C-alpha cells in the first residue's frame, strides 16, 4: 500500500480517517498534533517556561521527552528537565530507569530520580505484601502523583508533562463517567488553571493513539522499556481498556470522539474547579481537596 500523501510505502493505516501514511508523514502528523496540544496547554506569554517531564522509560513518556526536545531545542525561552519515580517494584522498574537516564543523557536533559522509599519509607512491593486485599493501583496512583508534584516543585517547573496517549486518556474519561465521578473528571489534566501548591500537568500525547506512539518511537530509534507492571492484572482500568478496544474495532475513531466530549464539557468543569478550595493535608502538608490526603489516609 502507498502513502496517501506521497508515493512512498505506507507503514500505518489511520483507521478513523482511512488514511495510509509512510514513516515521514506519520512523524509529521504526530508532531503536528503534539504542537497543537502544546499551544493549547502551555502559556508562553509569561516569558521563560520550565517544563519537567515525568519519564518512566516506557514508550509514552520517552516519546513525550523526545518530541518536546525536538520542538524546543532551538527555543531560548523554554527549558526542559526530567525525573523518574521509582516505586520499588522488583524486576520491573530497573530497566525503565536505565532507559530514562540514557535518553536524557543522549538529549542533554538533566534527569533526577525520586523514590517511594525516600519519601514514604516503603516500597510498592512492601505495600502489596502487607495489604494483599488492596488494589495496588489505588495506592500507587496517589503516591506517584504526590511525588510528581514534589519533584516538579524541586525543579522549579511551571508544568509537568505526562506521557498519556489518546487510549489512556479516553479510558480515564470512560472510567469517570461510569463511576459518576464528576470531581475526578474535573481534576483531569491538562490543567489550564494554576492551583496553589500544584504544578500544572500537561498531556502532549493526548491526541496520539498508542499504536502511533510505538511507531514514532521505532522510526526515531527511541529505546523504551516494554515490560508490564506485575500488578497490572489487578487494575480496574483493564475492563475499560477492553471496552474501548471493542468500540474502536466496531467504530474507528471512538477514542477521538470521547476526547471531543471531554473537551466539550471542560468549560463547565473548569467553573466547578474554580469554586473549589485547595487545602493542605493536616499530616504531610501536601495539597489536597480534603483534610487528609489520599496517601496519608491510606497509610
Protein language model regions, located:
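ATP-dependent adenylation/nucleotidyltransferase module used to activate substrates
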Residues: 2-187, 195-198, 207-220, 293
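Flexible helical/loop "lid" subdomain adjacent to adenine-nucleotide binding pockets
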Residues: 31, 167-171, 177-205, 210, ...
Amino acid at each position: 500500500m502507498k502513502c496517501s500523501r506521497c508515493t512512498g510505502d505506507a507503514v500505518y493505516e489511520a483507521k478513523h480517517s482511512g488514511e495510509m501514511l509512510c514513516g515521514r508523514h506519520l512523524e509529521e502528523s504526530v508532531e503536528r498534533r503534539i504542537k497543537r496540544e502544546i499551544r493549547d496547554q502551555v502559556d508562553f506569554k509569561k516569558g521563560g517556561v520550565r517544563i519537567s517531564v515525568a519519564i518512566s522509560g516506557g514508550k509514552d513518556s520517552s516519546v513525550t521527552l523526545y518530541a518536546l526536545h525536538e520542538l524546543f531545542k532551538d527555543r531560548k525561552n523554554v527549558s526542559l528537565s526530567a525525573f523518574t519515580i521509582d516505586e520499588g517494584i522488583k524486576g520491573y522498574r530497573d530497566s525503565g530507569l536505565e532507559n530514562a537516564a540514557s535518553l536524557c543523557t543522549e538529549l542533554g536533559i538533566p534527569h533526577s530520580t525520586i523514590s517511594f522509599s525516600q519519601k514514604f519509607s516503603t516500597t510498592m512491593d512492601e505495600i502489596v505484601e502487607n495489604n494483599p486485599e488492596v488494589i495496588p493501583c489505588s495506592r500507587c496512583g496517589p503516591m506517584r502523583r504526590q511525588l510528581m508534584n514534589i519533584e516538579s516543585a524541586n525543579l522549579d517547573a511551571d508544568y509537568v508533562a505526562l506521557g498519556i496517549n489518546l487510549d489512556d486518556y479516553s479510558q480515564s474519561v470512560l472510567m469517570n463517567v461510569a463511576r459518576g465521578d464528576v470531581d475526578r473528571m474535573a481534576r483531569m489534566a491538562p490543567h489550564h488553571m494554576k492551583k496553589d501548591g500544584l504544578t500544572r500537568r500537561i498531556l502532549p500525547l493526548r491526541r496520539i493513539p498508542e499504536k502511533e506512539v510505538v511507531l514514532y518511537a521505532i522510526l526515531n530509534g527511541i529505546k523504551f522499556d516494554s515490560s508490564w507492571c506485575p500488578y497490572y492484572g489487578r487494575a480496574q482500568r483493564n475492563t475499560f481498556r477492553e471496552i474501548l478496544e471493542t468500540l474502536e474495532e466496531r467504530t474507528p475513531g471512538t477514542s477521538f470522539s470521547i476526547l471531543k466530549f471531554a473537551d466539550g464539557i471542560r468549560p463547565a468543569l473548569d467553573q466547578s474547579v474554580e469554586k473549589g478550595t485547595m487545602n493542605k493535608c493536616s499530616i504531610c502538608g501536601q495539597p489536597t481537596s480534603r483534610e487528609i490526603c489520599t496517601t496519608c489516609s491510606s497509610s
